[in-house]
Amino acid sequence: MKNKVILITAFIGIFFTSCSKFLDQVPDDVLSEEDIFESLVNTRKYLAQVYTNMPDEFSCRFAPSNYAGPYTGASDEANYWSLSWVMSNSLNQSTWDNTAGGTFWINWYKPVRTATDFINKIDGANDAEVDDMIKKHYKGEARAMRAIFYFWMMRLYGPVIILDKEVPVNGTGDEIFFARTPFDECVDYVVGQLDSAYAEITESVQNTSQHADQPLTYSNVVEYGRVTTGVCKAYKLQVLMLAASPQFNGNTQLANLKNQDGTQLVNQTYDAGKWTKAVNAAKEFLEEFDGTTYSLYKETDTDSWVAAYKSCKNVIVTDWNTEWIFGRPMSTTSDYWYDITPKLVGYSSDVAKGAGFLSVNQSMVDAYEMKNGLRITNSLSGYSSSGFSDFKSPYDLKARSTFNQWVNREARFYVGVTYNRSYWQNQAGSTEVIPVFEYSGNSGKVQSSWDVTSTGYIVRKQLATTGYSSRGWVYLRLAQIYLDYAEALNEVDPGNTDILKYVNLIRVRAGLPGYGSGDSDIEAPTTQSTVREVIRHERQIELAFENVRYFDLRRWLIAEETMGANVYGMNVYADGDDFYEKTLTYNRRFLQRDYLWPVPNDEILKDKYLVQNPGW
């Protein structure tokens, strides 16, 4: 922890617009504390500082810079293996240290402290400039963002230090030294703060033209990316899901995680009631917002498979659509765009080129189902692991020779994965653009020792047709809420019809048959454990490459067998038929200590009460 709270030394201006300038950082003049709440402009700028440390996940290659996380490349979904300096690679080898791992602990306490100061002082703002509606709404936003930053830290570090009051700027001794707060108390605090923020935002807009479930409108512009009542309820569910899951619900592997006075920081007894709290939170959200404020994003087409593809693709790249609950607008997505665009050597200059080194792991490719809704391990699925067929993907203009592993897969596969010799989405000019990942191909190893895919696949999901211009990154969307509800309900009331109902809503949107007993259904799982596996599988596919899988595997305590598994892909050192051989890309390891990130060692040395996570 820092020994001081700096109230304000400089502002970071935020232009809250529906475009890409939402979190543009513009240094302003140094202002005194009295100046901050004297005008609406300065008050907005100070609130903007709370939002500023939200992660720019388009910069995940450079994590932890820009507060981006290494989560996609550090999960079993994908990798940046060809780039030795990328943070996810040290996680994948468990060679990282508490310097890199502690970055978010330091960076996210900054907005926590700013939010606390804002909450304590906003009521004294100049009434002539900042009316009561704005005061209460902004206070609710700051309170919710403080809770969300705590949640983001909790899913990395476990028990954190809850600072509900300001730390004196010139404090000493026990005024600035703190022990970690037991995890269940962290959960109760965050839930309580989100409930309070929900109430404040709701009350603030009464008798106004604003709506609590919509972002504020300022100067006739909707300020997307701001906290709403829906955001409060959705993150309440997220923290309760984390608390109910095996990682923090009776996890005896953390029995030795205690404060210096012996206080147990993670409960050692399983509590089924935590799942009930998650179920109730999910119901609260769905009853208030589902079908009104939010709905599953869907597009149409004469071909139902193409409609499914368009729906599953554009729910991610169509900013602020009906499914988005919370996200961050960005002025550029160039880093990520470069990561998922092939090298394409030899094409004219009007063809946009990248590297394509955010590589999909073969295990992720294999997880996608077939078009008929069966897994590739099912003998009735029609899957073939060898040979070629003339096949037209849902985004292609014609049929072309395609490796049979990639033929007739579910629509979400074509949303998520760019494979060898597939039709490139962003065409230019009259020459057809086709990426070739074989060794001698236009995007193969011969072109670069590191600036190409390591597995013969590239992540495709965030690929937009607008290049790398301003776009939003969605943190949380309705499909995840559906799956959260199904998961929690299966732990509380196995066999409840709502469980597969909400799973099936997502599957049908993806063009797949649902689980059931009808002629067109997939046979439904019948036990709690098999339903649990179905839900986890659906989360893996639906939420792929959205920074969800990394945290799921940890909270389920199965990261050692998944994130620690070796990575396979195609043979990127071969051409022709030899390319299509499943080949070991590299070995991974995941140690027990990696379930929790390390607290920065400097903070341990400064704070006499602060204890480190096990194994660090």
Where are each of the predicted segments found?
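Long, intrinsically disordered, low-complexity segments
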Residues: 19, 108-111, 189-191, 220-223, ...
